[in-house]
Regions:
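Long, amphipathic alpha-helical stalk/connector segments used for oligomerization, subunit docking
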Residues: 207-214
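Cofactor-binding active-site loop characterized by glycine-rich and histidine/acidic residues
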Residues: 1-148, 155, 159-177
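Conserved acidic/glycine
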Residues: 1-6, 221, 225-228, 232-321
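Conserved thiamine diphosphate
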Residues: 99, 109-115, 166-204, 248-277
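Flexible loop/turn segments at secondary-structure boundaries
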Residues: 15-19, 126-127, 153-157, 196-198, ...
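Glycine-rich, charged/polar anion/phosphate-binding loops
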Residues: 131-134, 200-207
Length: 321
């Protein structure tokens, strides 16, 4: 549903999104982690930003515009949570204007304003003021944007009950829901482990927003974390045993596996081969990215050592002891 010409405005959890639209490879992901300064190896920021800060290139090397309607686009991520929201609104507003106004030279930028702006945000960041400001403006202007709210019931260690009224952002925003008399948002909810309904939900979201320029909220619930918020954290410290047991049973990857088996799309042995091969692919990408990062350093060191040796010999000629 993320079609050519569309724009993403997300945050630093969207590596799967970027790989799905073929704008990120595993090697590039690890090159970002290693802060490789070679723009060809780390095209997102040449090592200047924290890992998983994504973008796509909008300009050719000569400074002219690329044909944006024939590529999948992403605005450049920044680290402040919630900061993707104003950019999301602006990108959606651009499509609105392209449909409304008869502008010149729009061939590379829009096809009748059909381009949807796709946003992503974590449930905890929906407590920020900028989130509500943007939703209000998007509802007033009726712009084509789809905002996905990834909800794992926690904001790092803080539960929804301690930060979100009604413990549900979609329920809290229910007054934004459009009806037959007044414009507003279309609010959709779906569980993150429910693959068929995810497909149906996002297809519906895209069709409504693209054709009618109606903003959409997709509240994706019951997401799980395989580990804590970061590799240095431990969710065992703030989640109950009951919650952790529930997450093990409802892990999205596990649920996807069950769905594949239940629908006889593949058998157990085939999935095991895929899983094992996938692990090897990731390991090899990691090694390749690390070696590519090290090679220029190793070569520079090799070139420097003879120079230092020559300097040492030259210095010793003067016998300055």
């Amino acid at each position: 549903v993320f079609q050519k010409g569309a724009f993403r405005s997300g945050y630093y959890r969207d590596q799967t999104f970027m790989m799905a639209i073929n704008e990120l490879t595993l090697k590039q992901l690890f090159s970002g982690l290693y802060a490789n300064t070679d723009i060809n190896e780390e095209p997102m920021s040449a090592g200047r930003q924290m890992g998983a800060h994504f973008s796509t290139v909008s300009l050719n090397e000569d400074g002219s515009w690329k044909d944006l309607i024939n590529q999948r686009n992403s605005s450049s991520d920044v680290s402040c949570t919630g900061s993707q929201m104003p950019r999301l609104l602006g990108l959606a507003q651009a499509s609105k204007l392209y449909r409304k106004l008869k502008t010149k030279n729009k061939n590379k930028f829009s096809v009748n304003g059909n381009e949807v702006a796709w946003g992503t945000i974590g449930n905890a960041s929906t407590s920020e003021g900028v989130f509500f400001e943007v939703l209000n403006a998007a509802g007033v202007h009726q712009v084509p944007m789809v905002i996905s709210i990834w909800d794992d019931d926690y904001g790092i260690s803080v539960e929804n009950k301690d930060q979100t009224i009604k413990q549900s952002i979609s329920e809290a925003l229910s007054g934004f829901q459009r009806n037959s008399k007044k414009d507003g948002f279309e609010i959709l909810t779906v569980n993150g482990w429910d693959y068929p309904n995810l497909i149906n939900t996002y297809q519906k979201a895209n069709d409504i927003s693209r054709e009618k320029h109606i903003p959409i909220i997709v509240h994706v619930k019951e997401l799980t974390q395989p580990i804590g918020h970061s590799t240095s954290g431990s969710h065992e410290r703030y989640k109950s045993k009951e919650r952790l047991d529930w997450e093990k049973k409802n892990d999205c990857n596990l649920k996807m596996r069950e769905w594949i088996l239940d629908n006889k799309i593949a058998i157990q042995s085939e999935l095991e081969v895929i899983e094992n091969d996938s692990k090897e692919i990731v390991k090899n990408a990691k090694k390749d990215a690390w070696q590519t990062y090290l090679n220029p350093i190793i070569n520079s060191r090799k070139n420097l050592i003879p120079i230092l040796n020559d300097l040492s010999e030259e210095f010793n000629k003067y016998n300055l002891d």
